[in-house]
Amino acid sequence: MSNFFEQELWYLFGDEQVIDTPYCSGQSCYGTLDRDLRVRIQFISTHISGQYDALKLTVLNRINGPVDIQVLKLGDILGKKPIPGNPNFREGVAPHIWDNYGKFEWYAYRPTEADYETVRQAVGRYLDVFRDRTLERTRNGPKLVYICAPLRGDVEQNITFAKEKAQEVFQ
């Protein structure tokens, strides 16, 4: 049975849209960025023990260890969230997970699907800095093909030949 942190991390990153080959264990989720880079994502407490209010992202070189570390506070990403009808939180609450005597749960405010997507986007933007863009450009960028045709003789026929070959390549 997975724990609360694993469930939340899997919900955020298990679809492989932000990280490849995600694996969640304990308070951490691991994934692949490219051939040599991995990422570890953890819920951490930044201010009060037992209040997990941030995600710590560690980019790891699989041979040489840590490359970069970033802490993304949920309150910075999502802002304070209103708790209607609760006089204790008139100005809202920064989303965080708390340790309620050994039971971990969201405190006062449970993130919406839009909130989860906002967190995914923030994490994705940070990790994009480290991704190998060569493969992406190859897949999504314009294609350039050289087709050799003699420019002497029947030039019109040679141009027609080149156009036909180009259409074959791009279909």
What are these regions (language model features)?
Residues 1-11, 23-140:
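Intrinsically disordered, low-complexity regulatory regions enriched in serine/threonine/proline
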Residues 14:
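Functional cleft and adjacent loop/helix regions within the main domain
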Residues 140-171:
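Catalytic phosphate/metal-binding cores of nucleic-acid and nucleotide-processing enzymes, i.e., regions
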